């Protein structure tokens, strides 16, 4: 399952699922992508289909492994990953080094176990007000789910996850 960033940073009022869907389509990717965010309807840990959570590695756009599987992100250790494996945007840029993302932080709105934090998810990702708060993770921690709180006006990285495995029919 691919973990890919949106092509630009966003504040807390992001229509992230739509953006993930649209940018994946424009990049020619065939499967469905959902935002790596907890929402008012769903905890982040349940975004990927149950049948695909345990045996499929999580990889970047180029197929390099970030996690053994989806469940391993939510083991309570904050989604520890190898910072030497880049996370790419849908247009192929490395979010860790590209200046288009001046703040190397990802929004997630979740606990370390991938459960929604209703007080810290920018009012279900509908506001960019400075007074509203969102849970996010600085990537230099080497974690996707580090527990830091930021104002929703910040423009951070939004990740998208391929939410079900589709094998290549030409494979």
Question: At which residue positions do the language-model features occur?
Answer:
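Secreted/extracellular ectodomain signature
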Residues: 1-171
